[in-house]
Amino acid sequence: MPSCRWTFTRSVPNRPNPTTRPSQFLASFRVLSNSNFAPFAPAVDMINLPYWCGENQRFVNLVTSDIWQKEVVSRVRAKGFKPLFFFCIDPRTAAKRKGLDDKPFKTPDDLKGIKFRVPGSKILQQFYRLLGANPTPVAWGETPTAIKQGVADALDPAVEALYAFGFKDILSGGTSN
């Protein structure tokens, strides 16, 4: 009888690329954020814009639409991946590292010169560059260290991530949508 082995991890530092193809006869499932998946399947990068879909139903409408299947899913499949579903964790929050200043982001001008942590998403890098920030690519697993060392000044995770990954101790307040 076939068996199934489940492995759950919070992060996978020092591990092979999480998007590598599985061995023959092995089903491999990965849960990746769209921003971390975008370098391997750039078509999904369009949904990385913070606050783009807003409400969950709008996101569901987008990723289940015929045009999404035609323009995005077909390109992801052409790269050798088969997405089971897309997910969006919102709202996002923009939070600064402790010691930078105590003021929350309120306007785009507040981002000028800020070293803003971004993943491998080209769209997010361009988004923050247009707002006047200095987008700083940092892998998710290295983000707490980068924030502590001042390599990055701010980031925009979902509120849940601030608590789940220990950021509440290294970031001052945040601004959420």
Task: Go through each PLM region and give its residues.
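N-terminal secretory/targeting leader peptides
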Residues: M1-F59, S74, K82-N177
